Design a protein with these regions (language model features):
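Short hydrophobic/charged patches on amphipathic alpha-helices used for structural packing
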Residues: 42-45, 72-74, 238
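AMP-dependent adenylate-forming
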Residues: 106-109, 124-238
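Short, well-ordered beta-strand segments
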Residues: 4-6, 12, 18, 31, ...
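Conserved AMP-binding/adenylation subdomain of ANL enzymes
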Residues: 1-6, 14-54
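Alpha-helix capping/helix-boundary segments
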Residues: 61-63, 90, 172
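Conserved structural elements of the adenylate-forming
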Residues: 1, 7-8, 141, 146
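Conserved AMP-binding
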Residues: 9-13, 36, 114, 169
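Gly/Ser/Thr-rich phosphate-binding loop
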Residues: 20, 25-28, 53-57, 67-136, ...
């Protein structure tokens, strides 16, 4: 195909595994953006222009830097058609910059920890978002079930009520390698299913359902944060 993927992901990152499958299934091309260019957003944009990149799937950090430097006022991306992002929260103010500068590009926010093999929810951004409004993580992906459970393991259905996001479906990992205690704590029997064994993954992420019935990420129940798509436990000391 004529599409070109602009890949910023390390080869061990889950986003790269998706890009690789897309590359083989669609017959498109891939441009591997060197790691050292991450500190030079202008060079990245020039590479996207030169290689006529039509699809990017990035952790938002570099996109935030591009927005803060107002680089899209100086450089256009005429070949870009699809822009997906995942791995950390994309501040809506900086996202709106991209959305307004590239009105013909389709944007999507994807969410999913590595334990469920890439992503379990998606949100195609087809409406205006206020700068102070968080970008929803949206709706379940195919073959994925999403449960929002309260502190009593009851399902949250009402709007604007917080609970822990739990995932079920075909994409779940079998557990953590050589760590049965951590596996037993995170991969548990679905408390809503009393009929047969059904494992769900407890993400530790706190979410709620807004008035549009979209899932919105609120925060963590622990001290874990994500930076550049990598997990960092703030409670750990060296």
């Amino acid at each position: 195909g004529s599409d070109v993927i602009g890949s910023l992901s390390p080869l061990v990152f889950d986003i790269y595994s998706f890009e690789l499958c897309l590359l083989m299934s669609k017959g498109c091309s891939m441009v591997l953006i060197p790691d050292n260019l991450s500190a030079f957003p202008v060079m990245i944009l020039k590479l996207l222009q030169e290689k006529k990149v039509s699809f990017i799937f990035w952790v938002p950090t570099i996109m935030v830097n591009i927005a803060n430097m107002d680089l899209l006022s100086q450089m256009s991306l005429p070949d870009l058609k699809l822009c997906w992002f995942a791995g950390e929260v994309f501040p809506t103010k900086q996202f709106n910059y991209w959305h307004h500068k590239l009105p013909n590009v389709e944007f999507a926010n994807l969410y999913g920890p590595i334990e469920i093999t890439l992503d379990c929810t998606y949100f195609k951004i087809e409406r205006e978002l206020r700068d102070e409004e968080p970008i929803p993580i949206g709706f379940p992906c195919r073959n994925t079930g999403i449960l929002i459970l309260d502190e009593n393991n009851q399902q949250v259905i009402a709007e604007n009520v917080e609970g822990e996001l739990c995932v079920r479906g075909t994409s779940l990992a079998m557990g953590y390698y050589n760590n049965p205690e951590k596996t037993a704590a995170a991969f548990v029997q679905n408390p809503l299913n009393k009929s047969y064994p059904e494992i769900i993954y407890r993400t530790g992420d706190i979410v709620f359902i807004n008035e549009r019935r979209e899932i919105v990420f609120k925060g963590r129940r622990d001290s874990l944060v994500k930076h550049l798509g990598y997990r960092i436990e703030l409670g750990l000391s060296l």
